[in-house]
């Protein structure tokens, strides 16, 4: 799908469709008022007859409006004008895209980017429109025999901006939006792949392909089980012992900073390509969704794609910690004591608390990069879903400025996170009679004790942990990976690169 920006009057547009907003109760937006005036009150007359109230997502498609050059006008309800916020704006864009795609409008000029969204500028509105459009049209049908496609799908969208001065900002928003949407799609595609295809070797192949595509400043190294053993990554290795598939850690290094020696930002993604729970096996119901336990690694892959496509002036390292947790004769057991790469020992009380065992060794491994900061991303705990539901990503950090940066980026990107505490009281729940710590701390505060566990392996750098167990995928009728938090982390890196889109 092609996107562009322009600045022009609605009555002069010669297009298959013009999209304008209507507020409650039956109030025309400024652009709709212009069209109404040109058409001698045609639109307002329809509204007076009750054709459209203006509630969020309501639509009315008009054909051959008098004195208008475009074939059709799509009126879209935007709710109450003063209440139009980020969430409603994206809902309106989503409904617009679906309506245009379903009604055979192959191209359209959209004036919704001129609506006032409190605290948001043209860059934000255009970028969110691009990302939302791509999200709305996303399908995962690679493995289906019969693929369905609209007879006349939407192929071109032009976003109108109020003044010519804002064209540059709009064009930059499209560039960033397309790159982020591409990263989100890449993460979703990986997440949606079945575990018989997407194993640690598949993740490694994708990481290598990314480096090949951006070979001027990107390289990928893959660390196998023999090298992990030599490095002392016994916690990581233990998790994969029950699987026929080799554990592989893919390390993607991108050097975009003119100062090649600048300390990198490191992203570490949990990549459990299937999590049966191991010996502490999960219930059968919903176990198919445990293919999504690699969405942390998928996020890192998607973000690295965004970084490379935009050629951000940063040094960034992405780690995909690939592994599979299966029961078997070689599987690790409750009661085992593992020596981690850091030298700390862990008593295994539950083999289904495996993600932290993979991550703790990966977090120790990345010390060699002398990182500016490290962020790990993991579908780590069901407790985080209980605490925050499916709307907010859980955030924990040992560094307040980093936590504040990430929360700010999450608000900018519309990919929200919420900070949880790391208090000494929670650390005590991890005490073990037989090792330095246990791998679980009981039911109470489970998301926090998991973060506390990881923090014991991050004392040499600034660190943040994103628990995406509630936000990485949807269940039910619309089951599928969401691609979160690619947008959050991409925004964080754009901000770090000084490309945050502020006018």
Swiss-Prot record:
Reported cofactor(s): Mn(2+)
Binding of Mn(2+) 1, residues: 275, 352, 354
UniProt GO MF annotations: aminopeptidase activity; manganese ion binding; metalloaminopeptidase activity
InterPro entries: Leucine_aapep/pepB (IPR011356), Macro_dom-like (IPR043472), Peptidase_M17_C (IPR000819), Peptidase_M17_leu_NH2_pept (IPR023042), Peptidase_M17_N (IPR008283)
Keyword Hydrolase belongs to the record: yes
E.C. number(s) listed in UniProt: 3.4.11.1, 3.4.11.10
Reactions it catalyzes: Release of an N-terminal amino acid, Xaa-|-Yaa-, in which Xaa is preferably Leu, but may be other amino acids including Pro although not Arg or Lys, and Yaa may be Pro. Amino acid amides and methyl esters are also readily hydrolyzed, but rates on arylamides are exceedingly low; Release of an N-terminal amino acid, preferentially leucine, but not glutamic or aspartic acids
A Pfam family the protein falls into: Peptidase_M17_N
Active site, per annotation: 282, 356
Domain of life: Bacteria
Binding site for Mn(2+) 2: 270, 275, 293, 354
Cofactor-binding details, from the entry: Binds 2 manganese ions per subunit.
CDD domains: Peptidase_M17 (cd00433)
One cellular component term from this protein's GO annotations in UniProt: cytoplasm
Recorded family membership: Belongs to the peptidase M17 family.
Protein name: Probable cytosol aminopeptidase
Gene source species: Yersinia pestis
Lineage: Bacteria, Pseudomonadati, Pseudomonadota, Gammaproteobacteria, Enterobacterales
Gene designation per UniProt: pepA
